[in-house]
Design a protein with these regions (language model features):
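Short acidic, Gly/Ser-rich segments with clustered Asp/Glu that frequently serve as metal-coordination loops
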Residues: 1-10, 14
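Short consensus segments that form the blades of beta-propeller domains
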Residues: 14-20
Length: 181
């Protein structure tokens, strides 16, 4: 998942004036629950921000997502969440992320006054699994850096939601082969 950021906001943990972490891009891939964790489907959703409608130059340079893409292709958050729910289907198991994506989505829903459509336990943060496996501080476990940290080829552009999902998936595969996931 990608959300609004500004120069220096990482160091400020997104707590600077006007720096609400508004979700702009959601990527989801489905994996088989087998030894090889094969990818079966994917979806990427652009979201039109409400609170921070103008993307920062820093965000654009970091993600490659342009203002015109968001303006023309971005969905309102309620529609994006409905698309996400349809893709996940009822009964879909846990959503793994490298961080607190579920919390950030919930914060976004609260901030714009819409219901969060997922159970609190739907999202699982793999930070602690990666930290235990790699013995790396969680702050250094950015999804787009996993290829370098774990020794695999990047599956796409850094800070692209689908590419980050594929980084997480490959990290999980490596951990599974090592008997750690």
């Amino acid at each position: 998942m990608e959300w609004t950021v500004w120069e220096g906001s990482w160091r400020r943990d997104g707590q600077g004036p006007g720096e609400f972490r508004e979700v702009i891009q959601i990527g989801i891939i489905k994996l088989t629950d087998t030894a090889d964790m094969e990818e079966t489907e994917d979806i990427q959703i652009l979201i039109r921000p409400v609170l921070n409608p103008e993307l920062s130059e820093y965000f654009i340079n970091l993600t490659g997502i342009t203002q015109s893409q968001v303006d023309e292709q971005g969905l309102p958050m309620p529609e994006a969440l409905a698309t996400m729910q349809t893709f996940l289907k009822p009964g879909m198991p846990t959503i793994y992320s490298n961080g607190v994506d579920g919390n950030i989505l919930d914060e976004n829903c609260q901030k714009i006054g819409i219901p969060f459509p997922f159970a609190p336990d739907k999202f699982a943060d793999i930070h602690s699994n990666l930290d235990d496996f790699l013995n790396v501080h969680p702050r250094d476990l950015v999804s787009s850096r996993l290829p370098e940290t774990m020794g695999f080829s990047p599956p796409g552009h850094a800070h692209d939601a689908i590419a980050d999902c594929r980084c997480i998936a490959e990290a999980l595969r490596i951990m599974r082969r090592a008997g750690s996931f």
